[in-house]
């Protein structure tokens, strides 16, 4: 059975676990006398073999407040690990990433609260998530979560960060707890039609998102609030087709040969000079993508597709147009002959005539008809960056080929 084969690949061995435990021993020594716990998928037993990142939470009394975490707590942690290979990262508040033997350990300051619904910062709920999941999943259930995670990674819908807008690890765990197994999650998802409500607990307020899973440890929160409709739909379609014809392609998609370029494709390569948090950068990239698309359409271009990918240093925006060539002039459609606005139309336009349909028309010159210039002008990054832009002629870049192909390898 395919799922058993996948598990052999993704389930960590005892050696894998020992390797991470050795790294954690180093961290434990550095955090001695602090109130800390290992959290996340490693602690819950739902981690994948290829994932070598571990979460360690350092807890402080809730009375010290959020500002204390951002300054005092962070400095305390840095002083304890400053001789190790570490970098600062940013979410709701800063945290530290330590790299030891190719294992990434996220050391996150948090506040110790009585229950998940009393969380002051988002990370304060984490230990309650851990307790909930470990009390509701047996060993087989953990393997079912692993299968679901790998499936979602394979089809590109895993990861709650803004860049992806997909399913979090916690969401996959709750789905398996609710439905009972990987296959049962897929059977349900294949029939989804939004809005979808999955209630392990009764919500404490109304939610408007397309997929609603109230957090069992804090029912005021929707666990899947960040999941985009596109990713919900992709997961549903993939579930349907996997159940029809199970394949390793869903878990480990293959690379395809070069695709034919249809239309004109503009590639914008951005190299960022400054570091910032991933969510901040990708919030600006998504706004840029929307602004570019809107500006191109307003200028008369027919946009087939526009996508962005990359990390926090190097980003690619690909714009696919029916054609990069549009006329310098265009037909401007005016009001009907009996409209009170015809005087205004006549004053503002030249080359005016009355059409066979009784409507006034004119010829107008486009303000902008260079698609490349329009796209570059509508990038709204707030950090310094260099940009290289070109019209695609050919490529061996796998991500660009994926953009050209459109159809996921698991679908066809």
From Swiss-Prot:
A single Pfam family it belongs to is: CAA_C
> Which positions in this protein are listed as binding Mg(2+)?
53, 55, 106
Q: What is the effect of changing residue 215 to A?
A: High decrease in both AMP and CMP incorporation
What's the family?
Belongs to the tRNA nucleotidyltransferase/poly(A) polymerase family. Archaeal CCA-adding enzyme subfamily.
Q: How does activity depend on pH?
A: Optimum pH is about 9. Active from pH 7 to 10.
Q: Provide the alphabetized UniProt keywords.
A: ATP-binding, Magnesium, Metal-binding, Nucleotide-binding, Nucleotidyltransferase, RNA repair, RNA-binding, Transferase, tRNA processing
Q: Which SUPFAM superfamilies match?
A: Nucleotidyltransferase, PAP/Archaeal CCA-adding enzyme, C-terminal domain, PAP/OAS1 substrate-binding domain
Residues binding CTP: 41, 44, 129, 149, 158
Q: How does activity depend on temperature?
A: Optimum temperature is 70 degrees Celsius. Inactive at 37 degrees Celsius.
S-S bridge residues: none
Outcome of mutating residue 106 to A? High decrease in AMP incorporation but not in CMP incorporation
What name is this protein filed under? CCA-adding enzyme
- Gene name, per UniProt, is cca
GO biological process terms, semicolon-separated: RNA repair; tRNA 3'-terminal CCA addition; tRNA surveillance
Species assigned in the record: Saccharolobus shibatae (strain ATCC 51178 / DSM 5389 / JCM 8931 / NBRC 15437 / B12) (Sulfolobus shibatae)
Q: What is the effect of changing residue 221 to A/E?
A: High decrease in both AMP and CMP incorporation
Listed binding positions for ATP are 41, 44, 129, 149, 158
Instruction: Say which domain of life the source belongs to.
Output: Archaea
Primary role? Catalyzes the addition and repair of the essential 3'-terminal CCA sequence in tRNAs without using a nucleic acid template. Adds these three nucleotides in the order of C, C, and A to the tRNA nucleotide-73, using CTP and ATP as substrates and producing inorganic pyrophosphate. tRNA 3'-terminal CCA addition is required both for tRNA processing and repair. Also involved in tRNA surveillance by mediating tandem CCA addition to generate a CCACCA at the 3' terminus of unstable tRNAs. While stable tRNAs receive only 3'-terminal CCA, unstable tRNAs are marked with CCACCA and rapidly degraded.
Q: What else is known?
A: A single active site specifically recognizes both ATP and CTP and is responsible for their addition.
Range of residues in the leader sequence: none
The EC code for this enzyme is 2.7.7.72
Taxonomic lineage of this organism? Archaea, Thermoproteota, Thermoprotei, Sulfolobales, Sulfolobaceae
């Amino acid at each position: 059975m395919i799922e058993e084969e996948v598990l052999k690949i993704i389930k960590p061995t005892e050696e894998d676990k020992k390797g991470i435990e050795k790294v954690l021993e180093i961290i434990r020594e550095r955090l001695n006398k602090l109130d800390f716990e290992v959290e996340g998928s490693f602690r819950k037993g739902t981690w994948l073999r290829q994932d070598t990142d571990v979460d360690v939470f350092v807890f402080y009394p809730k009375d010290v407040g959020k500002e204390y975490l951002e300054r005092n707590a962070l400095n305390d942690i840095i002083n304890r690990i400053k001789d190790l290979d570490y970098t600062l990262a940013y979410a709701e508040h800063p945290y530290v990433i330590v790299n030891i033997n190719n294992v990434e350990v996220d050391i996150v300051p948090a506040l110790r609260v009585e229950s998940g619904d009393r969380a002051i910062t988002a990370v304060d709920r984490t230990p309650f998530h851990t307790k909930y999941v470990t009390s509701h999943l047996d060993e087989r259930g953990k393997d079912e979560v692993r299968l679901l995670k790998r499936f979602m990674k394979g089809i590109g819908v895993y990861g709650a960060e803004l860049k992806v807008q997909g399913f979090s690890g916690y969401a996959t765990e709750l789905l398996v707890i609710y439905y009972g197994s990987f296959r049962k999650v897929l059977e349900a998802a294949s029939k989804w039609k939004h809005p979808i409500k999955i209630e392990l607990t009764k919500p404490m307020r109304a939610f408007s998102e397309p997929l609603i899973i109230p957090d069992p440890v804090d029912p005021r929160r929707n666990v899947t609030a960040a999941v985009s409709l596109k990713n919900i739909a992709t997961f549903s379609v993939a579930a349907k087709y996997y159940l029809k014809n199970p394949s390793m392609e869903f878990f480990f998609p293959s690379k395809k040969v070069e695709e034919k370029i249809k239309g004109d494709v503009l590639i914008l390569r951005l190299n960022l000079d400054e570091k910032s948090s991933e969510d901040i950068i990708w919030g600006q990239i998504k706004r840029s993508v929307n602004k570019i698309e809107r500006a191109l359409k307003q200028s008369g271009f027919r946009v087939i597709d526009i996508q962005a990918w990359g990390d926090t240093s190097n980003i690619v925006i690909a714009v696919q147009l029916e054609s990069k060539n549009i006329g310098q002039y265009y037909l401007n459609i005016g009001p009907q002959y009996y409209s009170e606005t015809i005087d205004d139309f006549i004053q503002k336009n030249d080359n005016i005539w009355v059409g066979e349909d009784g409507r006034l028309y004119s010829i107008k010159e486009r303000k902008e008809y260079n698609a490349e210039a329009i796209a570059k002008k509508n990038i709204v990054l707030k950090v310094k960056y260099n940009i290289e832009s070109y019209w695609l002629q050919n490529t061996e870049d796998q991500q660009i080929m994926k953009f050209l192909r459109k159809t996921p390898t698991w679908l066809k």
